[in-house]
Design a protein with these regions (language model features):
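Predominantly five- to eight-bladed beta-propeller fold
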Residues: 22-27, 76-77, 153-215, 243-246, ...
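Conserved beta-propeller blade repeats
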Residues: 46-61, 96-112, 129, 136-151, ...
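Short glycine/acidic-enriched loop and turn motifs that connect beta-strands
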Residues: 67-71, 158-161, 247-250, 326-330, ...
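Short loop/turn segments that connect beta-strands within beta-propeller blades
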Residues: 83-87, 123-127, 201-204, 264-268, ...
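N-terminal cap/lid segment of alpha/beta-hydrolase-fold proteins
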Residues: 445-485
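Short beta-strand element of the alpha/beta-hydrolase
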Residues: 478, 486-496
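The serine-hydrolase catalytic nucleophile loop
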Residues: 487, 498-512, 527, 670-671
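Active-site-proximal cap/loop segments of hydrolase catalytic domains
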Residues: 511, 516, 524-720
């Protein structure tokens, strides 16, 4: 279930459970490893960098780091400041409670930040802290206007669009009367939604503000992952561009049609920049595939019926750029850069020649080009697109860049970067006119003290042919103390999404280096359905979950077993989460005894149940196509339901570990429980690790360590 927020996922997953606070000031770990091998405890000892902001003069950078205590089972966000060359690093945080979302104000004289649900400010040296807001409702995000006279405040409001409010005389009643869809989202019941408020900044502080969406039952930013990046100030501080999907109930659950709106703070008038004023959306049948409905007709595609998010004004104020997907209901459609000319209303898509996703971007200082991050062949690099649509790749290498911004000198960019052997760190990029030649200098070394104690597995890349004659790339991760003369147990890694790239990602759970440290070779294929290999490759999977993508998995592991002498073909396992978990459940009935064990995390097991269980109904509508009860199913829908993993349990013959979070409303926990129960009824060795308090991810430190220990205990039991 690929989202626009791919680049921010690691930071989000690492910080979401930091809300619970204690008086213990959790800081940088001084853990000493007992061996040169990575452990679960070492993973949780790592600082997690994010939220970097360069000062207006480009000379300093403020950023935040998340630290965790396994003992306390909590995390803590800390603010740091440093020179833009990486020198003079200083910790600004003094509280045991989170201080986050730092930004520069007053021309760089002060730093604003969030603390205990309010906006505060301080000097760049951390002195003279001052509370700026006194909101009765927690502030969850903010953004000052360029002139410093106004501020956007993100607050949550009660919402009863899908869940009725209980009678006032039953204050202890816990039941929820649901009247429409969108009553649950990701990991929570939808009983509040976020709204943006525009407040004035005065000498006496910040006013309460005006709700941009007053009396409108819509959220902004978009749940569950959207943040302040979905709103932007105009250069003259008079307008705000914001992202919103103005739908409720079934319409919300079935549609990905978010738009960019322009709000004038003086007149309080709002204009939809994506659609004409007289636009009327074609009727949608939620039980039929959106692929062939009128909403996705060639004529209606001119009205931006897909995702439109993350607006950014050009420095000269003439344009607004945003990320845009063409089709409604297709959350993994190609992310393009749309440039809107404010004077004429003309929209231009400037990355059409780049046949992959744009994941983040920033304007160049001349307003004539845009820097963007894009995935290609398993790596996320920096590109530049002119307003005329000319695209050039600036950086190259086996890594993933993320969260890019231009420094005020117009000559350097600040970005995060990570790879399979390094967690995210900050880099300064110096663009070069020559293709793939831009220099990137590392300026933070947050976890060097831990890396210096570890031996990491080598990363390699290999290409092989698929069953239909295409070229398939897969990553190979070798064991930490690799001996080419030995044979090793080997894991086939099945990616989720189903359209998320197997890039040079770093995960604090699905971490390839901890697999290497435990003596496993990892085979990680960029199978059919993944971005970075062209639209045809990416889109082939929709409606064909059990076809060519599964053949690609088997092509990769068969190639490795046949041609890599260190791969022990008699000790193979398959592991994966989400769509990767679905893949494991399917392969369990179709692997012809290749594998000796399986691990499936939060995977779909019964696709008929999944069609109506998942809360984002657009996903199953697009991927499975028609509702399973329809008598005139499309051919893809028929194949999808006929090949659901639960229909092949009679062919299961291999030990399987099922893992699931009970707060996972994307793929409900009954999917994992059903798979485990089926295996045990058939007498197959199986275990179920269930987390009552985790969602699609595992976010709490002790749960994370339990996950890792269970994961490797299971693999070691059957593969060593």
């Amino acid at each position: 279930m690929y989202k626009q927020i791919v680049l921010a996922t690691a930071l989000l997953a690492g910080s979401m459970n930091m809300q619970a606070q204690s008086d213990i000031n959790i800081g940088k770990s001084k853990i000493q490893l007992q061996s040169k091998l990575m452990t679960p405890e070492a993973l949780w000892a790592m600082g997690r960098i994010g939220g970097a902001q360069a000062s207006p003069n480009g000379k300093q950078i403020v950023y935040q780091v998340g630290y965790y205590s396994v003992k306390e089972n909590k995390g803590h966000q800390v603010l740091y400041i440093m020179d833009s060359n990486g020198k003079n690093v200083r910790q600004l945080t003094t509280s045991a409670k989170n201080e986050t979302d730092a930004s520069w104000i007053e021309g760089g004289k002060r730093i604003a930040y969030l603390f205990e649900g309010q906006v505060w400010s301080m000097n760049p040296d951390g002195t003279e802290r001052k509370q700026l807001t006194k909101s009765t409702t927690d502030i969850e995000g903010y953004k000052f206007s360029p002139d410093g006279k106004h501020i956007i405040l993100i607050k949550s409001l009660p919402y009863h669009g899908s869940i009725k409010e209980n009678p006032s005389d039953l204050p202890k009643a816990t039941g929820r009367l649901v009247t429409d869809m969108n009553y649950r989202h990701w990991d929570h019941y939808v009983e509040s939604i976020q709204h943006p408020f525009i407040a004035d900044v005065t000498e006496n502080g910040i006013t309460d503000g005006v709700d941009i969406l007053a009396n409108e039952p819509y959220e902004c930013p978009l749940a569950p992952f959207g943040g302040i990046e979905q709103l932007a100030w105009s250069k003259d501080s008079q307008c705000i561009a914001y992202t919103c999907r103005k739908k409720e109930g079934v319409e919300y659950a079935i549609s990905t049609d978010s738009d960019i709106y322009l709000y004038n703070i003086g007149t309080r008038e709002t204009k939809n920049l994506c659609k004409p004023a007289d636009y009327k959306e074609p009727a949608i049948d939620p039980t039929k595939t959106m692929k062939t409905q009128a909403v996705n007709s060639e004529e209606n595609l001119k009205n931006n019926p897909g995702y439109d998010v993350n607006p950014k004004f050009s420095p000269d104020g003439k344009y607004i750029a945003w990320l845009s997907m063409a089709r409604n209901g297709y959350e993994s459609d190609r992310n393009r850069l749309c440039v809107y000319t404010i004077e004429t209303g003309e929209k231009t898509y400037i990355t059409e020649s780049f046949d992959s996703n744009v994941d983040d971007f920033c304007w160049n200082s001349d307003s004539k080009s845009i820097y963007f991050l894009g995935i290609w062949h398993g790596c996320e690099n920096l590109y530049k697109a002119t307003l005329k649509g000319n695209v050039v790749q600036l950086t190259d290498g086996w890594h993933d860049f993320g969260s890019v911004q231009l420094l005020n000198d117009g000559k350097h960019l600040l970005a995060e970067r990570h790879d399979m052997a390094q967690a995210p760190e900050l880099y300064i990029i110096t663009p070069d006119k020559k293709e793939k030649s831009s220099k990137a200098d590392q300026i933070t070394f947050e976890n060097k003290h831990l890396y210096d104690q570890m031996t990491f597995g080598k990363i390699e890349q290999r290409w092989t042919k698929t069953t239909d004659g295409k070229d398939l790339m897969y990553w190979i991760v070798l064991p930490s103390n690799f001996d080419p003369n030995k044979k090793y147990p080997t894991l086939l890694f099945c990616e989720g999404g189903p359209q998320s790239p197997v890039s040079q990602f770093w995960s604090y759970r699905w971490n390839f280096q901890i697999m290497a440290a435990n003596g496993y070779v990892v085979i990680a294929p960029n199978r059919r359905g993944l971005p970075g290999f062209g639209s045809e490759w990416n889109e082939q999977i929709s409606g064909d979950w059990t076809g060519q993508c599964m053949n690609d998995y088997l092509s990769a592991i068969d190639d490795a077993a046949a041609n890599l002498p260190y791969v022990d073909k008699d000790r193979l396992g398959a592991v994966g989460a989400s769509f990767g978990g679905f893949s494991v459940y399917y392969l369990a009935g179709h692997h012809d005894k290749r594998f000796k064990c399986f691990i499936a995390h939060d995977g779909a097991f019964n696709l008929e149940s999944m069609y109506t269980d998942t809360e984002e109904a657009w996903f199953s509508n697009w991927e499975y196509e028609d509702a399973y009860w329809n008598k005139d199913l499309t051919e893809n829908a028929r194949k999808t339901y006929e090949n659901s993993p639960h229909k092949f349990v009679d062919k299961w013959d291999t030990p399987i570990l099922c893992i699931h979070g009970e707060k996972d409303y994307r793929i409900n926990a009954n999917q994992g429980m059903g798979a485990f129960n089926a295996a045990r009824m058939r007498g197959i060795p199986a275990e179920l690790l269930i987390f009552p308090d985790e969602n699609h991810w595992v976010l709490k430190p002790q749960n994370g360590i339990l996950w890792q220990r269970t994961f490797f205990n299971w693999l070691d039991r059957w593969l060593k």
